């Protein structure tokens, strides 16, 4: 997606060979026009997949997930990282390790929002080692729902997340596939 590539080149900051900072437009400050384009693109890619729900993890996946849900006309559910007094029922949950934050946390969704008849599209800001995606897949399976695909805004292709998801037979659509961050330069798989 050329608009996303351009934004990454202009405003992304390479912090190391492993870490790309995109807080200027995606995971701190949000560019609404770019999110609209991202939602349009994911909706086009998955329009014939029978999606009934979109699932993401708070917080950075919420903006692209909402725009995709708006385009597809389906609800968006975000897995919470922190317990809430309003989440009182037996939750669908999984643990996830954050590569960027270097911490493990439990994410949870109320079972009232996912059913066995749902076809779920996972939307996330990044795909690195695939741990967040695997946690969401686990939660969706706990509900008996079907994972219809994964929409990733930025994939770090040099890490193993996509290979793992591919080997499990999941459809993965990434809007920007980063080949390398070596030398402080973002190189894309075109």
Swiss-Prot record:
User: Can the keyword Acetylation be found in this entry's annotation?
Assistant: no
Query: Pathway membership of this protein?
Result: Purine metabolism; XMP biosynthesis via salvage pathway; XMP from xanthine: step 1/1
The places in or outside the cell where this protein is found are: Cytoplasm
Query: Which one GO biological process term can you cite for this protein?
Result: xanthine metabolic process
One GO cellular component this record assigns the protein to is: cytoplasm
The entry's 5-phospho-alpha-D-ribose 1-diphosphate-binding residues are 128-132
Extract the InterPro entries matched here.
PRibTrfase_dom, PRTase-like, Pur/Pyrimidine_PRTase, Xanthine_PRibTrfase
- Kindly give the CDD domains that the UniProt entry links to this protein: PRTases_typeI
Alphabetically sorted, this entry's keywords are:
Cytoplasm, Glycosyltransferase, Purine salvage, Transferase
Q: Its Enzyme Commission number?
A: 2.4.2.22
Q: Which residues bind xanthine?
A: 20, 27, 156
- Give yes or no: UniProt keyword Flavoprotein: no
The UniProt entry lists the main location of this chain as: cytoplasm
Q: What class of enzyme is it?
A: transferase
One GO MF term on file is: xanthine phosphoribosyltransferase activity
Q: Which reaction does it catalyse?
A: XMP + diphosphate = xanthine + 5-phospho-alpha-D-ribose 1-diphosphate
Task: State what this protein does.
Answer: Converts the preformed base xanthine, a product of nucleic acid breakdown, to xanthosine 5'-monophosphate (XMP), so it can be reused for RNA or DNA synthesis.
Quaternary structure and interacting proteins, as annotated: Homodimer.
Which family is this sequence assigned to? Belongs to the purine/pyrimidine phosphoribosyltransferase family. Xpt subfamily.
Provide the protein name. Answer: Xanthine phosphoribosyltransferase
């Amino acid at each position: 997606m050329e608009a996303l590539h351009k934004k990454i080149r202009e405003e992304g900051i390479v912090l190391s060979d492993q870490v790309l900072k995109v807080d200027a437009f995606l995971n701190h400050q949000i560019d609404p026009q770019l999110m609209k384009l991202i939602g349009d693109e994911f909706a086009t890619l998955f329009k014939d997949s029978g999606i009934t729900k979109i699932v993401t993890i708070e917080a950075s996946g919420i903006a692209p997930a909402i725009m995709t849900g708006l385009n597809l006309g389906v609800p968006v559910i975000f897995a919470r990282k922190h317990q809430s007094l309003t989440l009182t029922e037996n939750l669908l949950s999984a643990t996830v390790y954050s590569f960027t934050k270097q911490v493990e946390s439990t994410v949870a969704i109320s079972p009232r929002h996912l059913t066995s008849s749902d076809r779920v599209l996972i939307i996330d800001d990044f795909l690195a080692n695939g741990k967040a995606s695997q946690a969401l897949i686990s939660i969706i399976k706990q509900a008996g729902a079907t994972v219809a695909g994964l929409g990733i805004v930025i994939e770090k292709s040099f890490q193993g997340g996509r290979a793992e998801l591919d080997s499990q037979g999941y459809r993965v659509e990434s809007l920007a596939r980063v080949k390398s961050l070596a030398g402080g330069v973002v190189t894309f798989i075109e």
